């Protein structure tokens, strides 16, 4: 598989970008040149080349994540286990940000 040359959009495919890996992708992107001529157009136009690049980049990130899955912390639950006052909190958003008590403005003496 040929290495994609970003100044030649016709060489950009999802599989060629994915095969670079993340390190190779960053190096190839940093070393890329401007498109000086239109002698190598992508079959689906510039947007097609961009789409192929993004798909290949996403696939390379997925491969990187899978390759290092054993070297990362296990995902942790966002909320603590069953809290005694869970019934007081709304069932959406970040539960820890809501007080389990009803919050009211302090009343000033002499006002209704």
Swiss-Prot record:
KW Glycosyltransferase (keyword) present: no
GO biological process: one example: viral process
Keywords attached to this entry: Capsid protein, Host nucleus, Host-virus interaction, Virion
Keyword flag Cytoplasm: no
Domain of life: Viruses
Pfam families: Herpes_UL35 (PF04496)
GO annotation, cellular component aspect: host cell nucleus; viral capsid
InterPro entries: Herpes_UL35
Subcellular location per the Swiss-Prot or TrEMBL entry: Virion; Host nucleus
Record note on quaternary structure: Interacts with the major capsid protein/MCP. Interacts with host TSPAN7; this interaction may be responsible for the presence of TSPAN7 in extracellular virions. Interacts with host MAPRE3 and DYNLT1; these interactions mediate retrograde transport of viral capsids.
Stored HAMAP family: HSV_SCP_alphahv (MF_04020)
Sequence similarity: Belongs to the herpesviridae small capsomere-interacting protein family.
Function description: Participates in the assembly of the infectious particles by decorating the outer surface of the capsid shell and thus forming a layer between the capsid and the tegument. Complexes composed of the major capsid protein and small capsomere-interacting protein/SCP assemble together in the host cytoplasm and are translocated to the nucleus, where they accumulate and participate in capsid assembly. Interaction with host dynein light chains suggests a possible function in the retrogarde transport of incoming viral capsids.
Name used for this protein in its record: Small capsomere-interacting protein
Protein's organism: Human herpesvirus 1 (strain 17)
Gene: SCP
């Amino acid at each position: 598989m040929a290495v994609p040359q970003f100044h030649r959009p016709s060489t950009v495919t999802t599989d060629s970008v994915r095969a670079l890996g993340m390190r190779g992708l960053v190096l190839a992107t940093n070393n890329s040149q401007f498109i000086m001529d239109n002698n190598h157009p992508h079959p689906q136009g510039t947007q097609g080349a961009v789409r192929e690049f993004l798909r290949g980049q996403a696939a390379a990130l997925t491969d990187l994540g899978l390759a290092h899955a054993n070297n990362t912390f296990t995902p942790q639950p966002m909320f603590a286990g069953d809290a005694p006052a869970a019934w007081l909190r709304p069932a959406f958003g970040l539960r820890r940000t809501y007080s389990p008590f009803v919050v009211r403005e302090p009343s000033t003496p002499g006002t209704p």
